[in-house]
């Protein structure tokens, strides 16, 4: 059910009921959705549980806001300044709303359902559906703008109020209306608490309880700062698949009359540009074996390639050296084994020779090395004692010889 923002609704009690969305989409949009699913050449076939979403397409409805016109109906018969400003805002706000949002509320809910399905099930088909829906809505909106442009320019503004009534009645009614409006706004429920996602950017922020009621009418709209616009652009670059770039600046003046404000408050429209942002969607196949390949940017890839080339060169240089080193190690091992075998053989032969020199174990071929060493030690000690004894005997014999020589000389001299 499209929302008509160009004509103001006089019955404000039922105005909020009229904007409640239907539970299901219109037949036309469902046919488009089914047709988009049946075309399987360019789009991915739907997920097995994609049709279940039709049962869950009801939007959460917040409780109705309190009436804003109950006390004003019997208070005054003439529109006050606040009423006139609100009517002008509604008349001029339609173009701004249609300019900033291509789809009407039902179409917005349809697009959001596609986005929800994109997040949960089919990533490729939902992107193409969303792109087609936005393109069609853009074409219809531009056609309606071209047809309705001259008519909107020639349409006169709301009739100015008649001669000023006595100051007591309108002032009292305006003050009463502002008071009721402030109380109603304080009693309203913030839609962000009820809705899981923001419906649109035109939803006003919740006013603090002590705010001025005149500021709640939305007479002046402060321009968005550069930081907010940069944050919105960053969010759009990160999330959106189709982005609408538009530059519109609207300035409203409350000091002039209603006709002058209508002439000055017409926004300067710029042509809408439909940007197609390519989003890389990688679906991970959990059944496939894990791949160790990692993709890097161009600069990092060049660095890695150069590093790999250097590593390959160094590896090529080292390719021959491991072989030579292995051969050298094998040669060293062979020579070491040969030398060790020779040493053991020599040691065995020396033990055999030592065993042959010891009389106690000379005939024992199975004598262990420890026994051979012990017997050899004992034999060496005995030989040393024999040596000392023989040396002492030799010394005695030498002295005896000297004595005998001396006696022989004495005998020779005595005979002469």
Curated annotation (Swiss-Prot):
Localization recorded for this chain is:
Host nucleus
Print the keywords alphabetically: DNA-binding, Host nucleus, Oncogene
> What PROSITE patterns does the record tag this protein with?
BHLH
Compositionally biased tracts (Pro residues): 156-169
Question: From start to end residue, where is composition biased (Acidic residues)?
Answer: 228-240
Annotated Gene Ontology cellular component terms = host cell nucleus
Q: Which residues form the bHLH domain?
A: 331-383
Q: Where is this region: Disordered?
A: 144-174, 203-268, 315-340
UniProt-annotated stretches for the region Leucine-zipper: 390-411
Report the main location listed first in the record. Answer: host cell
Does the keyword field hold Transmembrane?
A: no
Which segments show compositional bias classed as Polar residues?
Answer: 315-324
Instruction: Specify residue ranges for compositional bias: Low complexity.
Output: 212-227, 245-259
Q: Which GO terms describe its molecular function?
A: DNA binding; DNA-binding transcription factor activity; protein dimerization activity
Judging by the UniProt lineage, the source's domain of life is Viruses
Q: Which Gene3D superfamilies match?
A: Helix-loop-helix DNA-binding domain (4.10.280.10)
Check the record and name the PANTHER family matching this protein.
MYC PROTO-ONCOGENE
Q: What does the UniProt record say this protein does?
A: Transforms avian and murine macrophages and fibroblasts as well as murine B-lymphoid cells.
Any further remark recorded for this protein? This protein is synthesized as a Gag-vMyc chimeric protein. The sequence shown here corresponds to the Myc homolog fragment of the chimera.
| Subunit description | Efficient DNA binding requires dimerization with another bHLH protein.
What is the name of this protein? Viral myc transforming protein
């Amino acid at each position: 059910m499209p929302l008509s923002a160009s004509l103001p609704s006089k019955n404000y009690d039922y105005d909020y009921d009229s904007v409640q969305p239907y539970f299901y989409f219109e037949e036309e949009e469902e046919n488009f959705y089914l047709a988009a699913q049946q075309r399987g050449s360019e789009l991915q076939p739907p997920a097995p549980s994609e049709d279940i979403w039709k049962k869950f397409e009801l939007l959460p409805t917040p409780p109705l806001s309190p009436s804003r016109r109950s006390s004003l109906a019997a208070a005054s018969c003439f529109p006050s300044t606040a009423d006139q400003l609100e009517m002008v805002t509604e008349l001029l706000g339609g173009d701004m709303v249609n300019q900033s949002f291509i789809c009407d509320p039902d179409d917005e809910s349809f697009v959001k359902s596609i986005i929800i399905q994109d997040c949960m099930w089919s990533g490729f088909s939902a992107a193409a559906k969303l792109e087609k829906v936005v393109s069609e809505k853009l074409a219809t909106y531009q056609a309606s703008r071209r047809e309705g442009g001259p008519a909107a320019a020639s349409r006169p503004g709301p009739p100015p109020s008649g001669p000023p009534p006595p100051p007591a009645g309108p002032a009292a009614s305006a003050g009463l209306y502002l008071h009721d409006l402030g109380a109603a706004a304080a009693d309203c429920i913030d839609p962000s608490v009820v809705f899981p996602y923001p419906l649109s950017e035109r939803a006003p922020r919740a006013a603090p309880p002590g705010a001025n009621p005149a500021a709640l009418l939305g007479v002046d709209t402060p321009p968005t700062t550069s930081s907010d616009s940069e944050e919105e652009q960053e969010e759009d670059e990160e999330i959106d698949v189709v982005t609408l770039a538009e530059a519109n600046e609207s300035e409203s003046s409350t000091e002039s009359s209603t006709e002058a404000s209508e002439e000055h408050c017409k926004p300067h429209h710029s042509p809408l540009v439909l940007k197609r942002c390519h989003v890389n969607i990688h679906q991970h196949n959990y059944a496939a074996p894990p791949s160790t390949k990692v993709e890097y940017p161009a600069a990092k890839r060049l660095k890695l390639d150069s590093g790999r080339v250097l590593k390959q060169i160094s590896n090529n240089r080292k390719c021959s050296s491991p072989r030579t080193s292995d051969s050298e190690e094998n040669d060293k091992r062979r020579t070491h084994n040969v030398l060790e075998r020779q040493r053991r053989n020599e040691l065995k032969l020396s033990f055999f020779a030592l065993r042959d020199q010891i009389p106690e174990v000379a005939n024992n071929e199975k004598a262990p090395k420890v026994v051979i060493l012990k017997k050899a030690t004992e034999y060496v000690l005995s030989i040393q004692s024999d040596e000392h004894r023989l040396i002492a005997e030799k010394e005695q014999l030498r002295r005896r010889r000297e004595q005998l020589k001396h006696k022989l000389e004495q005998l020779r001299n005595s005979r002469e």
